[in-house]
């Protein structure tokens, strides 16, 4: 029955939480979420508030504290939700809570690789404290965007029982 969706009475609506302060794939998230009829919640600092945001987009603004968006997301996700973030610390916090966590570049964070990512983040922090700075991430390109959309569709399709 194409186009029909059956929701069990005890099934909670899935939400895509987006760590939105510097997220470059907001449009891709909205488009894909619309196709799968999934709620989206963009979480951002009040420092990034804009009056021009579309009414279709759902935004939650939090204090400008460094970790406020992460804490909001961590406190509001539920099993089955999806989180889009580039924050490795937030990803590590959510992985054991049955939440799919992915980067803006279309990489799925996994429990068996998150420790390595955390070690890399720790090493980079130590280097910065010594005054050694690495280049920042490359600008998001078309392939990154396509990989992101493909992974998000795969997660949502698998959740709907459509296996890839």
From Swiss-Prot:
Coiled coil: none annotated. InterPro entries: UPF0178. Belongs to the UPF0178 family. NCBIfam families: PRK00124.1. This is UPF0178 protein YqxD. It comes from Bacillus subtilis (strain 168).
């Amino acid at each position: 029955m194409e186009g029909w969706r059956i929701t069990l009475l005890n099934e909670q609506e899935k939400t895509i939480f987006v760590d939105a302060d510097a997220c470059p794939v907001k449009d891709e998230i909205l488009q894909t979420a619309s196709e799968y009829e999934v709620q989206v919640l963009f979480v951002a600092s009040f420092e990034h508030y804009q009056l021009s945001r579309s009414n279709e987009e759902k935004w939650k603004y939090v204090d400008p504290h460094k970790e406020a968006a992460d804490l909001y997301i961590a406190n509001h996700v539920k099993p089955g939700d999806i989180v889009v973030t580039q924050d490795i610390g937030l990803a590590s916090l959510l992985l054991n809570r049955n939440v799919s966590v992915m980067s803006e570049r279309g990489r799925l964070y996994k429990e068996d690789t998150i420790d390595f990512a955390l070690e890399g983040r720790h090493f980079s922090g130590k280097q910065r404290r010594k005054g050694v700075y690495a280049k920042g991430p490359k600008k998001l390109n078309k392939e990154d965007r396509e990989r992101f959309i493909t992974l998000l569709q795969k997660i949502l399709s698998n959740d709907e029982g459509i296996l890839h």
